[in-house]
A protein has these predicted regions:
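Active-site-proximal alpha-helix that buttresses catalytic centers in soluble enzyme cores
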Residues: 2, 7-66, 112
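Phosphate-handling substructures
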Residues: 62-120
Length: 126
């Protein structure tokens, strides 16, 4: 039986400030690096990562002697107009309220919908 582990990248500055960080290619922050150094996982047979720097850095810290394969389709969702902003910065944006009211079912303005992101991610697993 094949086991697939989905591991979220370590903390970034954007995460620290509760920003929507999707296509923004930012590195791990020092705290994120330190936290990852205290985590261990069993050695996997293969490692597939997003092309984003934070994901590659996470894999390198967790599995330092293993080769990683970059899969473009595994990249995070494109948050469009909400990218690199947090809820406080978006609170007066009517598009943000409409997205909230839709329970996140609407596409991000100028970005992807959950369905588009999921379909792209699924392609990466095939």
């Amino acid at each position: 039986m094949i086991k697939i582990w989905l591991i979220r990248h370590g903390m970034t500055e954007g995460n620290r400030h509760q920003r929507y960080i999707g296509v923004t290619d930012e590195p791990l922050c020092p705290e994120g690096i330190e936290r990852l150094k205290n985590i261990t996982y069993p050695k996997p047979q293969a490692i597939f990562v997003s092309p984003l720097r934070r994901c590659q850095e996470t894999a390198e810290i967790l599995f330092p002697e293993q080769k990683v394969r970059i899969i473009d389709q595994l990249a995070e969702c494109d948050f469009g107009a909400f990218e690199n902003k947090n809820y406080k910065e978006l609170s007066d944006d009517p598009r943000y309220q409409a997205w909230i009211d839709s329970n996140g079912m609407m596409a991000f303005p100028g970005g992807e919908s959950k369905e588009e992101c999921a379909a792209r991610n699924l392609e990466g697993f095939q």
